[in-house]
């Protein structure tokens, strides 16, 4: 009984945190339609899944790209629907396996469905928790497809590759200049990246021209 009471109290905290989401650019009527946002999430969810399989290239701030037509979104939507149906089939075949597969989509649903997050229509950090489901599925697949010694060897190789990629990515966080330069190199139309670079250059001597160019690009 007390366990359920504690769970219910956590819902109250969640509700309180949700009261002010509109001021942070989350909600309806803020300039991005639910339909266009939902179309964009078809692409976003597949991107998160691909990055879970191999996290490259990672972009700190992808800006607010938006798909506005079915013609642009239907390849993503078709593949996403197929994956959801596959997860439902897995649920029918094996409840634990299906639950893990569905967990990826369910955990993404609050921010990757139809309620627009205007300032960041695609954001890699939303996939942090859902990625646990992908890791579990990968481990189960390796365990079932490979013999135990090969499983250990494969896991060691994957861990080594992931560690190297993590080390390389952490280098981008050594300074604001490096982080936003990397972001701009991968998302060249991102106004926030231009703005932050402009702020960095404006704070330095003899960098006024660079700051001015980035301020113009941010407008």
What are these regions, as identified by a protein language model?
Residues 1-219:
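Polytopic membrane enzymes that build or remodel cell-surface glycoconjugates and lipids
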